[in-house]
Amino acid sequence: MKYSESEIRQYVAEEDVKFLRMTFFDLTGNQKNMSILPDALDRAFSAGIAFDASAIPGFGDELRSDLFLQPDTSTLCLLPWRPDHGRVARLFCRILRSDGTPFEGDSRALLQKAVDDAAAMGVSFAFGSEMEFYL
């Protein structure tokens, strides 16, 4: 479900959310997180939360290391394993360059482009995930 920015602010206040995990994925599919306080939400929605991309393999070097995380409002989720008091919520993020253009290594943007390109050719995708382990 897509929430508005004001609905997310209201939800954060009503549910006693103390931290928001800004979640993204590196080029090998590993989940990465940055935590922000609720008072940083306005900045996250408008300009994004800056991070040093040179710290993530494949994301850039020191010369092009400024990237920004901008939350996708349709992905708000309260993390259930956290306490009822001082809760933590998660938002998946788009990765943007400082000029607002999408970062070419953003796996979610790459997937969306593939889906859009396929739809333009009359093809649709169905995705699923599977938990797997070996003993």
Where are these regions (language model features)?
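ATP/Mg2+-dependent ligation/transfer catalytic cores
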Residues: M1-L135
